[in-house]
Structures are given as C-alpha cells and as structure tokens.
Design a protein with these regions (language model features):
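Small-molecule kinase domains that catalyze NTP-dependent phosphoryl transfer to phosphate-bearing small molecules
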Residues: 45-101, 108
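Generic structural signal for well-ordered alpha-helical scaffold segments
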Residues: 1-4, 103, 107
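ATP-dependent NMP and nucleoside kinases share a basic, alpha-helical "lid"
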Residues: 1-64, 70
C-alpha cells in the first residue's frame, strides 16, 4: 500500500517482498491497475539450495529442523510467478547486471 501511494505521487517505488501465492500478487497488480499506476513484477528465480547457501541467519536450517514453521520454500509452498515482467536468475549475471536490467524496465 505504501508503494502504491508513492507510485501514485510519481515516485518509483521498489518493494522487495516474498509473495508466495499468485492470489496475493494478482491482488496487488489489480490494485495498481485500478489506481492507474504502473506495476512491474520482477521474479528473482533463485533455487532454494542457493537461498540456503546465502542465508546468514541460518533460517533455512531452523525451518528444516522444524524449529520454524510456515517458512516459504521449505515447509510452506511457493507458487512461482508465471507472468512477471522480468525474470532474473543467478546464473544469468551478477547483482550489477540484475540491477541494470531492473532499471531498464523501470525507466524505458
């Protein structure tokens, strides 16, 4: 909602969210459309194994051991986006290349 308010006032708002269900993503997309505000979905398609390797807090290990429940990708489902405007994969480039791709789609 904050991103929608910012975008409505002309600010490019970037929100990094875990949105595990298509229904939630569709709801946000529809809210933007209803407000006449552009919406760009970027799917950072990273395998769970890579996420685990990059996890500095050990949250994936805690989820796998059962100490954390409802953890997306481990013991709670994740519905991968099928209609994202941009899909980024770790194997396709580094963080700088991905940032450039995002900026290009936001500022055509």
């Amino acid at each position: 909602e904050v991103a929608l308010l910012l975008a409505d006032s002309g600010v490019v708002a970037i929100a990094s969210l875990i949105s595990p269900f298509k229904e939630g993503r569709d709801r946000i997309r529809a809210a933007h459309a209803a407000a006449g505000v552009p919406f760009v979905e970027v799917f950072v398609d990273t395998p769970v194994s890579v996420c685990e390797k990059r996890d500095p807090k050990g949250m994936y290990a805690l989820a796998r051991s059962g100490e954390i429940t409802g953890f997306t990708g481990v013991n709670s489902p994740y519905e991968a986006p099928t209609d994202a405007e941009l899909v980024l994969r770790p194997s396709d480039g580094d963080a700088v290349a991905h940032a450039i791709a995002i900026m290009e789609i936001l500022t055509p």
